[in-house]
Amino acid sequence: MDKLKIEASGALAGNVVISGAKNAALPILMAGVLAETDFNVSNVPNLRDVNTSCELLRCLGAEVTRSGTDKVCISTTNLNEFCAPYDLVKTMRASILILGPLLARYGTADVSLPGGCAIGARPVNLHLQGLEQMGAQIEVQEGYIKARVDGRLKGAHIFMDMISVGATENLLMAASLADGETIIENAAREPEVVDLANCLIAMGAKIEGAGTDTVRIQGVESLQGCDYRVMPDRIETGSFLVAAAVTRGKIRCTKADPKSLEAVLAKLEDAGANITTGDDWIELDMQGKRPKAVNIKTVAYPGFPTDMQAQFCVLNALAEGTATITETIFENRFMHVPELSRMGATMELEGNTCIIHGIERLNGAQVMATDLRASASLVIAGLVAEGTTIVDRIYHLDRGYEHIEDKFKGLGGHVERVKS
């Protein structure tokens, strides 16, 4: 099992090219099941979760071809299996997103209950309730969701009890091939949801209101393949910007999307960073200054993203002052705190709030990644810690960051992948 070995690196400097968004690519790849002709997707990151998604589609009988560094072509001509097995689904929670497309196009789907990061329960009930409102018969038996529909799904007026990105995406895809109009209220507004909707529209779907809390979908008879480019990864972008802020450096993120990161950029400015942006780039300059502590509360988009919470824990650990970070999206999402404490960070947990007292420096240590974003925070901490930091279990990192050690090296970071 690989590890990352990290040495104190000084101020990061230079340009880093941002990859396609994992959280947009995964539902877009699943949407390929809806297309009757070849579906070509570009700017697809080379990640463990993307590879799992491609393997899942192949398991169903789809032909999946990867070309170049970022292109995937999906053909469903020979798709003849409708079961997403446990061995694949257990490693990736986003596998649940195959449920809506299979059910909408083929009328049947058996999907193992999902795995992925160990961040709270994250139940799938919102996905199932919405599909049942659209006429699906659903049972959960022996760890599998078994869904059937006679004929086509029917449009429905769905009010979601809580905001769920995954459920919004599943219902968007299912409703695109349903009879009649579907209205989703209290829908997720995340940019990745909008990216999926734009992709479905390019395939022939009729969708209005994506990016607002009320989305209307008029079902169509069929969807066709198209050429679609996945949006930039806003969380990868934010992670590199925080790393630059913590190391008091100056970097430019290219092929980025500033509009999708407004809440994060505002907090970085509060921390003392100079931020400049263009249409597809973001530059951060700390001018050698120590960051200031910033209070954070994670909320659904367009608020501060939960996927950036761990990285800001590191920023506040080294900042001037005391800050609180409150997590309102997922329970059990402070598993990085004990690991950062091993490196000398001064942090206290009170329920869903972390109180962080900034200190001058961290110390290198052997630490363990517990989930995807926590692992990124440990890498950032290692860049500024005195001595050597070893991050174990980096398979979490490989689920969401493409060539992270190479990108940090390009900015002057001393990061090396080593075998156990």
From Swiss-Prot:
User: Domain of life, per the record?
Assistant: Bacteria
Single biological process term from Gene Ontology: peptidoglycan biosynthetic process
The EC code for this enzyme is 2.5.1.7
- The record lists UDP-N-acetyl-alpha-D-glucosamine as bound by R93, D307, I329
The answer, when asked if Cell division is one of the entry's keywords, is yes
Q: What class of enzyme is it?
A: transferase
Could you state a single Gene Ontology molecular function term? UDP-N-acetylglucosamine 1-carboxyvinyltransferase activity
Q: Which residues bind phosphoenolpyruvate?
A: K22, N23
Q: What GO CC terms are in its UniProt record?
A: cytoplasm
**What does the record give as its pathway?**
Cell wall biogenesis; peptidoglycan biosynthesis
Q: Which Pfam families match?
A: EPSP_synthase
Q: Which InterPro entries match?
A: Enolpyruvate_Tfrase_dom (IPR001986), Enolpyruvate_Tfrase_sf (IPR036968), MurA_subfamily (IPR050068), RNA3'P_cycl/enolpyr_Trfase_a/b (IPR013792), UDP_GlcNAc_COvinyl_MurA (IPR005750)
Provide the function of this protein.
Cell wall formation. Adds enolpyruvyl to UDP-N-acetylglucosamine.
Family statement drawn from the similarity comment of this UniProt entry:
Belongs to the EPSP synthase family. MurA subfamily.
Could you identify this protein by its name?
A: UDP-N-acetylglucosamine 1-carboxyvinyltransferase
